[in-house]
Amino acid sequence: MDVIKAVKKRKSIRGYKPDPVSKEVLEQILEVASQAPSAMNTQPWEFTVLSGEVLENIRKGNIELLNSGALPNPEHVVTGWPRESVYRQRQVNLAKQLFQLMDIPREDREKRAKWLRRGFRFFDAPAAIILSTDCCLGESGPLLDIGAVIQTICLTALHFGLGTCIEDQGTMYPKILRKYAHIPESKRIVVAIAIGYPDWDFPANKVETEREPIKNVTTWIGFD
């Protein structure tokens, strides 16, 4: 698959087949992704790859805390979007599509809660990649570089027939990740990537998102 086709094909997969993803395939993906650019070749990323019993324990731990009413405590602060902004509207538009595909009425709190829990379970993917960085690098310094390696992981996964979903809900309770995945306190947990073979019969995987026309977000200077 060429690069342009991969970029256009990539989408967030929220439903997966139970088939396991081999360590060998995941290792190949990370080998390629590690070629992503970073400031002065600092490579400020670390990967914790989860599967099997450990991933199941993390799912259960996340859901137990969520159901208990425990407040999320992410180490990478996730901020919302201004209510009247175009950014918030884009998010709302996507949520409407997903809820329609999943047959979740706006007023059905039980179904909405069930959908929310999927994110805390890494969308039931057979594997997940946790991205972390060294705490000595500060809050925002390495984020651009980590964004580059995330995109590269997602694009490379397509070569192996895999789907991905970049998500933060799975990292909302870092103490659960540290307990089962043994991520040291010296590392700041940034984000997760659910990864596996897409279940194309899962309704949410049929969602199609739009992109703002380039003319609306680009200023050309010095061109005829």
Indicate where each model-derived feature is located:
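Acidic, surface-exposed loops and disordered segments
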Residues: 1-224
